[in-house]
Amino acid sequence: MKRYIVLWIFAMTFMSSFAQCGIENNAFKSGEFVGYDLYFNWKFVWMKVGTASMSTVQSSFKGQDAYRCSLITRGNSKLDNMFVMRDTLLSYTTMDLAPLYYRKGAREGKRYYVDELWYTYPKGNCHLKQHEINSRGEHYWKESEYKDCIYDMMSIYLRARNFDASKLKVGDKIPMPIADASNISNSWLKYNGVTNVKMKNSDNKYRCLVFSFIEREDGKNHELIRFYITDDKNHLPVRLDMFLSFGSAKAYLTGYKGLRNEMTSKVE
């Protein structure tokens, strides 16, 4: 009997360590697929330069139930003439969205690199294993442990879709430290309120919640991405504004299937 009690306590401790970095998911379900068109500002003209597709399915990771989320971006011939872009991002999270694994394989220009992250949660902490393969093919490894939760660009996307905006005020900031293979950024999400957004590739309009992803570097705040997500239970991103070091880009929703909730934010 004592053995079962010990095992039960261990199991509860193990699960609670995940729970502190997770969040209840009410926004999406397994089988959601979303598509986007990508646009780049070239000499003050917006050009369509590629596509992005995202899928989320229930899977498993090291024997436990997990969400598997992937994002694939592909530039077209117009962009290839200026800057080759082939990115594939993969993320595994627990069913309550605590991150477990992240990988980014990216060809950007003449540079190809890989970022990998593994997450474990010993004693309620967040243990992070980082692996980098740089453009020269060199491998770098690092391990560290934190009392606070650490995320990546995919797991933060899933987490942000489940925020309760009714409890937020314009200007509120939500700390969100983001890791890649070599660094952890001092970053946060800022809530900017509600607005209507028209798609560039159609006449569809959506009532959206607006968030900015901001990173502090060299003593300055830098807005890297502005998210427009539907003001309904799906919290589906319909537009992203990306502020890049070499210009600006936008992504607009083109289609979706497998949503968990009714799309009630569409403006007629």
Region locations from a protein language model:
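Low-complexity, intrinsically disordered regions enriched in charged/polar residues
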Residues: 12, 147-150, 247
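Sec/Tat signal peptide C-region and signal peptidase I cleavage site
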Residues: 15-19
